[in-house]
Amino acid sequence: MSAKASKAPASKAPAEKKPAAKKTSSSTDPSKKRTKARKETYSSYIYKVLKQTHPDTGISQKSMSILNSFVNDIFERIATESSKLAAYNKKSTISAREIQTAVRLILPGELAKHAVSEGTRAVTKYSSSTQA
């Protein structure tokens, strides 16, 4: 028993200091080029619609940016509303029905009617093209 009493508590040795790793800048190394982050926009689609309706009309970059923000905003509103509708009905999938109801709730009057009819037409066209 005297052996246990004479045993001293283990002392902790200080951690060894490691030399600091050299920081290599990726901007100085030409072999590692940094790819630019791509930004998803609706610009090409907006431009195509513009040329279908007004072939001789152009659009400025600022106007394109505003329209792109508008499309993103409407998309987000419809997605959020349709997500809520799916949750209310205890469904985990957003279907065309939820999208259509969300459009009716978000867009006012005549605009909602036109949007629903165009959306239905687009879905029908897509369905017929995938079956063929």
UniProtKB/Swiss-Prot annotation:
It is found in: Nucleus; Chromosome. Residues 1-39 are annotated as: Disordered. The keyword Ligase does not apply. PROSITE patterns: HISTONE_H2B. InterPro entries: Histone-fold (IPR009072), Histone_H2A/H2B/H3 (IPR007125), Histone_H2B (IPR000558), HISTONE_H2B_site (IPR055333). Residues 1-13 have a biased composition (Low complexity). There is a cross-link at K7, K17, K18 (Glycyl lysine isopeptide (Lys-Gly) (interchain with G-Cter in SUMO)). The modification N6-acetyllysine is found at K7, K12, K17. Keywords: Acetylation, Chromosome, DNA-binding, Isopeptide bond, Methylation, Nucleosome core, Nucleus, Phosphoprotein, Ubl conjugation. It comes from the Eukaryota. There is a cross-link at K125 (Glycyl lysine isopeptide (Lys-Gly) (interchain with G-Cter in ubiquitin)). Belongs to the histone H2B family. PANTHER family: HISTONE H2B (PTHR23428). This is Histone H2B.1. The lineage of its organism: Eukaryota, Fungi, Dikarya, Ascomycota, Saccharomycotina.
